[in-house]
Amino acid sequence: MDANQIRFAIFLAVFLLMLGLESIIQRHPTVDAKTRRLKINLALAGIDILVVRLFFGAAAVGAAQFAGERGWGLFNYLQWPEGLEIFLCVVFLDLMIYIQHVVVHMIPFFWRFHIVHHSDLDLDVSSGLRFHPIEILGSMLFKIGLIFALGPSAIAVLIFEAILNGMALFSHSNITLPESLDRLLRYVIVTPDMHRIHHSVEKRETNSNYGFNLSIWDRALGTYIHDALKPQPRIIIGVSQFRASEEVSLKNLLMMPFREVPENHSFSPEEK
């Protein structure tokens, strides 16, 4: 299998596993029709894939191969052991994705596109696919720039992409973990309960828990919140501007950054 087939196989396995678990150990009650949301979020994901293919072709793994063939990037000069390079690549890119996530909340122009992700009225595994195509393009451009500068191997990028995709699905999933397990996992990775706080309508909670994979960045950089104002099953998901199902149709999501003037979600001292 090539890189894209491997990524898709991992994605599909995690997606179907989380989807199945949500029907058995659901954590948060739903307010919108799951089938309707699933169709919308999958449609957005399909559009995103087509857009990335159109503009970037082989995307991140292809960028690593391209850089390696030309000797670009730090790792291509250092010639460190492959295992060490993979570890450093995963950790470094995870930190950069965390920083990118903070930035799209702080800068109003970027928030206009990222609000599409936060406008979901419920949070489940399909929410991990809900991104505006322009945000996906910007994110991919940022990631390719990092890959050119770092020079990781294609296998390192493939491993990172697989982890990122899988953890995005896991952290957005609407599943119940035993409290003791959730508490233990949070020391290392982002759990669904931890990330659900980030999708709260409460502005202070929206501006917290930015990580997708490793939880250490939120803890180390002061953006971690352990508990929401409300108990987990009572957290109101979404943003205050869009509370009706008809406001978050596929067409409206695609046009949302251009037709609406969302509230500024940048930090202020009292909100941190």
Question: Model segments located where?
Answer:
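Loop-to-helix transition at the N-terminal end of transmembrane alpha-helices
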Residues: 6, 33-46
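Membrane-water interface of transmembrane alpha-helices
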Residues: 14-27, 99-109
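Cytosolic-facing loops and C-terminal tails of multi-pass membrane proteins
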Residues: 230-272
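Membrane-interface helix termini and inter-helical loops of multi-pass transporters
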Residues: 64-77
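Hydrophobic transmembrane alpha-helical segments in integral membrane proteins
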Residues: 1-13
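Hydrophobic core of alpha-helical transmembrane segments in multi-pass integral membrane proteins
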Residues: 10-20, 60-61, 132
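Membrane-embedded catalytic scaffold of the fatty acid hydroxylase/desaturase
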Residues: 46-59, 78-234
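Membrane-interface helix-loop junction between the first two transmembrane segments
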Residues: 21-39
